[in-house]
């Protein structure tokens, strides 16, 4: 195991340790103990920049379950390193921010355990080269995010938001699992890099389209794309550090990472290009439109996050066009990848800061309701400055980093209309139109976000508590991000060669991509589009009160959230009715369903699959064997017609003893002896127990009841017999008995094969069987003791009553 493996597992290890630290040492805020972990990891991953800048990659392998294609292989390239730096870098700032946000009275041991669990899961997800391991970390992010969102579990809204996020993302995870299975079948491997190298082979597979659809569903649920975005707004009930971490820089970017990583495999399909682009643009438009009507600051940021994720998704879709061209023409569309990666970084900076400032405002005023806020400019000047910088960046206004990536976004959306491929030159006109409209509403909610908090009149009477500027410690993290917004806007070359180009090369499978960003490109279509966005946006802000009521009057039934809740209400009711049709509470009915299903499956398989029953190696039936079989059949048949329990027990014992005689004739005396002992003890116990039971009252079953029993019994007997004969006559592998014959002495140092198998070769199985018997015995002992205790209590109660009388 390499140092890279340790780096990925480090947060998971400390997630187990931190709760114990909190339990025994509470004098210092637990966050100070956690902070060094992401700091050390961030510094460690910075050391890989020189490697990825030179075009090299690193593969660290660790065998886990190679026979199942599950090896813990980690792969560091430009894309994985970018996400690792975001996860650990933003993680440092989040932990620092949480120290001032969460008081010591909170369950900090739980919080930081969940946070580190999530951090480790995200690192494993973005660095794993094995699809199965990636999926395990993918689901671990869903699980840990559920714990984080429901951290304040005394609030019903937190539980609701956590459940919704869990249901939607786990649904996507199951879809992703299906896609992974089909993809690994098509490519013959679970290694992502090997799959990329075998992309041409996968693209001719009949599983190609199905795996693509399933992978996209998984990615879109995780990154809150339309129509799966419904979980993200309700997830805002989490503590602000969680929202700032999960929903600005990490979890919601996991779907984008998956799309970027899978692009070299699926980019050949026009379905991939159109779906990723269209879904991204629809998400951008719909979420930005909904963000304008939100009354909660976190609600605004939630929908703005969804819209920004849609924007990045659309850029990844357009960038996939580059796989259909070569040379300079390909570089035109690779620029969309460049814009996507740059905006991925930019979004983490300005959105992370805005979430933290929202938490600061809530911490200061006691509310996030925009109707109660306003006029905080003079009261919270530092918070205002940070909000101004980051909101203008989100709006796409120079000289901030958001402007540069937004310009690249518009250029890519306009440029793709020139592609004579997949009808992009005709239907593609909708792409820049949708992008521009979505950008207009992005401008509107970004600018209004500033005014709703800090401008206007101060409404002291509406605030739960007197507003004040928050502590310097709470402002350090958003201040750092605000500074980065300015630095990356004025000096984008800091990121170009070191971070962006290696990441773009990893997505586009190239080595010569260039990332150049300029504040002014000339009088281009993108420039005029930006001017139009500003002008229309300002007009909409001025006339906001005249048109917003139209959005607020949107019928509830036209929202996806309404149908999600409807489905959640209806499903348990109808599923309960359906379950009641076959779960009746009677063991016999359950067994009928189980055996009937097995019989039907087996018979259908036998009918559609050719098989052969070979009797050539079957030994002759000896007379005494025939006699024993007749005895077994006779005894078993008589149990059916028995009129007393005693007779049934005797006949069942006769069957067992007859089978034991078989064991003797077939050379297994120890097994026969064991069978004799078991039968004798069982018979004695049954007789002792049934002696104390009331007489057997027979009741007449209906004819249909008996008929079903007969059909199931005969069917099960036929199926087992036929399958046994088929298995005997079709031996594709050597008998395992030869292994035991060869190694029973030299490996286990025993001469009795049956005993050696039970005690040595299958020792663990025997141990657990013994454990089951022990647990059953403890259960019986407990029931007897409880009954005796209750009997004594009843007697004591009677004595008390008599005394009182």
From Swiss-Prot:
Molecular function (Gene Ontology), one example: antiporter activity
Compartment(s): Cell membrane
The lineage's top-level taxon is Bacteria
Entry keywords, A to Z? Antiport, Cell membrane, Hydrogen ion transport, Ion transport, Membrane, Sodium, Sodium transport, Transmembrane, Transmembrane helix, Transport
TM regions (residue ranges): 1-21, 30-50, 79-99, 117-137, 166-186, 201-221, 226-246, 265-285, 300-320, 337-357, 377-397, 427-447, 480-500, 531-551, 591-611, 623-643, 646-666, 671-691, 707-727, 766-786
- Keyword Lyase applies: no
Tell me the Gene Ontology biological-process terms attached to this UniProt entry. proton transmembrane transport; sodium ion transport
Task: Report the membrane topology from the UniProt record.
Answer: Multi-pass membrane protein
Keyword Cytoplasm appears in the UniProt entry: no
* This protein's GO CC annotations: plasma membrane
- Homology family: Belongs to the CPA3 antiporters (TC 2.A.63) subunit A family.
| Biological role | Mnh complex is a Na(+)/H(+) antiporter involved in Na(+) excretion.
- Quaternary data: May form a heterooligomeric complex that consists of seven subunits: mnhA1, mnhB1, mnhC1, mnhD1, mnhE1, mnhF1 and mnhG1.
Mind telling me what this protein is named? Na(+)/H(+) antiporter subunit A1
Which source organism does the UniProt entry give? Answer: Staphylococcus saprophyticus subsp. saprophyticus (strain ATCC 15305 / DSM 20229 / NCIMB 8711 / NCTC 7292 / S-41)
Taxonomic classification, please? Bacteria, Bacillati, Bacillota, Bacilli, Bacillales
